[in-house]
Amino acid sequence: MLDALETLVLGPARALVMSVEERTRVAYHEGGHAILGLLLPGADPVNRVTIVPHGMALGVTYQRPEDDRHSYSEQYLHARIVGAMGGRAAEEVVFETHTTGAENDMQQATDLARQMVTRWGMSERLGPVTLAPRDGTAGTGLENLGFGGGKPYGSATADAIDAEVQRLLEEAASEATRLLQTHRRELDGLAAALLEHETLDEPAIRRATGLLVIPRVAPVPLRTAVGSNNTAATAR
C-alpha cells in the first residue's frame, strides 16, 4: 500500500488497458530509473516502483531522501540527471527505440541542467557566474540595462549556455546507457518482477535485482556541476 505522501506525489491510481508490448516497455522504463537509483552515488533511496498508472503517468519510480535537504551537492545533482535518463536509456538498451514516454524525464533533466549552468555557477566553461534573469526588476527601468526583464547576456553567452546544457544531458544519457548495459541482468529481473507483481517496495526491488548489498558505482563527473526536502517521483 502507498503511504499518504506517496499517494499525494504520485496521484490516484487509474484503470488503463495497455497492450502486452506497452506494459513490458513501461516495466523496463521504470526498471531503468530504479536500477540507476540503486547504483548511483548520492541518489535518493528507491522506495517503490510501480507500473500501475497514476495520474498522467503510466508508471512511477518513487524515491524519497533519507534526511531533509536544504542544499544539493554536485554528486546528488549528477545522480538526479543520470537517473532521469534511466527510462529512456532502458528502452534504448532493450528495444533499440525511443518513445514519447520519456518526455517528462527529459524535461526534468533539462531544467536541472540549465539551472546548474545559469543559476549555480557550475559550468567550467562559463565559470562562477549567475546568468539567470533576476526577479523583482520588471517595471523599474533597469530591464534595458540587463537587470531583469529578459536575458542579462548576449547571444554568444546564450549559445554557450545551450552548448553546456546539451553536453551535460548527452553525458548523462551516455552514462545511463552504459550502466544499464552493464547491469542488463538486474534490469531484466526487475522488469519481470514488475510484470508479475505490478508494484514493488524496496526489499522486493532488491530481491528482484539481486542487489541486496548495493554496489554503488564510482561517479563519472559531468565536469560542471549545486545545492529541501525533495521527493523525487520519476514518471513515465
Question: Model-predicted segments: where are they?
Answer:
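Interdomain coupling/hinge region of P-loop NTPase helicase/AAA+ cores
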Residues: M1-L16
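Soluble catalytic regions of large protease machineries
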Residues: P12, E22-Y28, A34-R236
